[in-house]
Curated annotation (Swiss-Prot):
SMART domains: HOX (SM00389). It comes from Homo sapiens (Human). GO terms for molecular function: chromatin binding; DNA binding; DNA-binding transcription activator activity, RNA polymerase II-specific; DNA-binding transcription factor activity, RNA polymerase II-specific; RNA polymerase II transcription regulatory region sequence-specific DNA binding; sequence-specific double-stranded DNA binding. It is found in: Nucleus. It comes from the Eukaryota. Transcription factor. Binds optimally to the DNA consensus sequence 5'-YYTAATGRTTTTY-3'. May control the expression of neural adhesion molecules such as L1 or Ng-CAM during embryonic development of both the central and peripherical nervous system. May be involved in controlling adhesive processes in keratinizing epithelia. Residues 261-279 have a biased composition (Pro residues). This is Homeobox protein BarH-like 2. Belongs to the BAR homeobox family.
Length: 279
């Protein structure tokens, strides 16, 4: 069942004279041993015309019944372009060819099935997805937070020039200021809705007309805040004056006549301890 190595010298004339003539057109006749020998010589002659070699196969075909029945399959796998148009494509032959090619690759690269196992492991392992690098969280200082909060109380939405000025004054970037404002507005909206009031923005997130204060409203609010602070400073001073007045004696309410000092107390005679004289 196996082809042994032979070495023959031949000429093109002899090869042409030995042209194979099929008796029938059955698949058994086309894939018989004689046809195998003929096409093997033809394929080797195309490589080296003066030397026709029929090599011994590296392994036996005992594992595949198709290769045992049709020895020409070994020639087809080595030179598929020579007789691919002569052999009809059947499912059994295609399966045998694929099995033969895989076994040859395994025996040539890594004995013991190491190459096959490595190729299967490479195909089975999915390629890991590259995770996007997370943006580092900005840590604000107390001074920066106070400045941002104070500006937010006055103006809930910043224009580009205002955002640039605020970022430069606090030593931040525009992106950091914008991100902080977005998070602060979300917190503010939740507080407003929790208090039972109407949402200060439209459903798409756009601010309503009344929610954005104008410059006049901002100036009026600043004036009111300054006045309130002035009143708070005056109230403690007035309270201290009232306490001082309450602690002073009420001498101013007493008339001058009654305000004279009282007479000094009269001295009483001290009784003597001596007994009275006897008569």
């Amino acid at each position: 069942m196996h082809c042994h190595a032979e070495l023959r010298l031949s000429s093109p004339g002899q090869l042409k004279a030995a042209r194979r003539r099929y008796k029938t057109f059955m698949i058994d006749e086309i894939l018989s041993k004689e046809t195998c020998d003929y096409f093997e010589k033809l394929s080797l002659y195309s490589v080296c015309p003066s030397l026709v070699v029929r090599p011994k196969p590296l392994h036996s075909c005992t594992g595949s019944p198709s290769l045992r029945a049709y020895p020409l399959l070994s020639v087809i796998t080595r030179q598929p372009t020579v007789i691919s148009h002569l052999v009809p494509a059947t499912p059994g032959i295609a399966q045998a060819l694929s099995c033969h090619q895989v076994t040859e690759a395994v025996s040539a690269e890594a004995p013991g099935g190491e190459a096959l196992a490595s190729s299967e492991s490479e195909t089975e392992q999915p390629t890991p997805r590259q995770k996007k690098p997370r943006r580092s969280r900005t840590i604000f200082t107390e001074l920066q937070l106070m400045g941002l909060e104070k500006k937010f109380q006055k103006q809930k939405y910043l224009s580009t020039p205002d955002r640039l000025d605020l970022a430069q004054s606090l030593g931040l970037t525009q992106l950091q200021v914008k991100t902080w404002y977005q998070n602060r507005r979300m917190k503010w909206k939740k507080m407003v809705l929790k208090g039972g009031q109407e949402a200060p923005t439209k459903p798409k997130g756009r601010p309503k007309k009344n929610s954005i204060p104008t410059s006049e409203e901002i100036e009026a609010e600043e004036k009111m805040n300054s006045q309130a602070q002035g009143q708070e400073q005056l109230e403690p001073s007035q309270g201290q004056e009232e306490l001082c007045e309450a602690q002073e004696p009420k001498a101013r309410d007493v008339p001058l006549e009654m305000a004279e000092p009282p007479d000094p107390p009269q001295e009483l005679p001290i009784p003597s301890s001596e007994p009275p004289p006897l008569s």
